[in-house]
Amino acid sequence: MTIYFKNKYSLLAFLLIIAFFAGCKDAWKEHTEPDMERLDRTLFEQISADATLSTFTTYLVKTGYDGVLKSSKAFTVWAPDNAALQNLDVAVVNDTAALKRFVGNYIANQSYFTTYPKPSLVIRMLNGKNTVFTKSTFEQANIIRSDIYVKNGVLHTINSASTPKPNAWEFLQTRADATLQKDFIKSLAHIESDTSKGVLLYKDPVTGKGVYQDGTTFKVSRNRYFQRIADISSEDSLITYIILNNTAFNIEKNKLAAYNKSSNALVADTLTQWSVVKDLVVNKVYGINELPDSMTTVTGVKIHLDKSAIVETRLLSNGVAYVVNNIGYQLMENKIPTIMIQAELPDSLRVPANPVTRIKNDASGRRFTDLQTGSITSSPSPLYYYRYKSTVNSVKYEVYWRAVNDILVLPFSMKVDFNTNRSFGSAILPLATVGYHTIPSIIGLAPTSDAYKDAYKEVYLGTYTAENYGTLYTFLASSLAASSTAPTALSLDYIKLKPVN
């Protein structure tokens, strides 16, 4: 009797286990297997069969995207439902081009399921704009139904809709309170030849410019701001862009005019406005609650945004923009940069023999590169020199150098001269100078001695004031009265021009 009941209950338990797993298998099969009928439909057929998407269906037909979504190529559609589209601006609906941009903002190439974002994806839509997709949202819209897999892609439905976000350049052009920034950047547009596919025949021996086969180059519109600073119209990068309202622009222009002087008033005005707008692009997106104390712009200048100065924040298709009525930064050695003239990069040389570039360690073990010409035994007119070309602001500079004499046993002297053209000058027309300074020898000194260590220190030479913004030629010149019995030399690591008030 006991054995009978035991076997009976064992059999019952076994049958229950089988039934449980069979049920699980059926449920899992139902969950995982796609709707076979749906896999025969295109995205357009799936959308048009859904009564809650009838308005979006109408827009697909009106813009020609119905044909796109009938093709064999894979797409993902985030379709706004009828309720989401009921308040769409009539001007967009009645403008075919605007409506096409709008609809294209909800279609992307390839299939994107809600399992893909970790935690988010930035996706390029068919209208060229970037959009943020997460497991549960599409931009600011919530995803109502997700991962509807059909023959040529994936459909998600969403509960709100908005016109495509502008990029930084498009947004700037809409700002009535920032016309000064907009107009100046627009003024930098120009026409040039695109030679990227040109067939080069030869280079002009006079101008050095290429001469191309007719019909292989073409004229294109470019903008110097986009070329030299950042293309703020590009959808291929994400940026933080600062827009100065007209009040802030004029404040900055008045502040910076003194450092961008020119003998030509129009040139000075252009230089000043360029200085105002060039340091406003950051190659990273900072939300308003993520703003650091300072942000480094693409030009290397550090800027500060006070939240109280922000007039408007706008999410862009290529980042975020802040319209501000004030911007902060350190002026000297930041906005007005320090000029570092590296010895090994001369613009021109006048020396009796080829100079030597050497890589060595200073007294602290730090590696540096200097340029040297040793045993100069004469002092011709003009003197021997290294010449360097740089661009300076109209400001007073403190002049420093680091120069080490490990060439001669005795000290030798050098000087630093300045000119706004490439001529070295003469006794009749001397250049602005900080005068001669003596370089003591380190030959024979113990590396641990103070004299040896001091020889590697930066040395203050004097000041030079640049009257105008522009090119400055800096000359490192040899000493006078050199002879075979009293030779001199040239030796330099760098010359530093530090701007000061």
Residues covered by each model-derived region:
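Sec-dependent bacterial lipoprotein signal peptides
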Residues: 1-24
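Mature, structured domains of secreted/extracytosolic soluble proteins
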Residues: 24-501
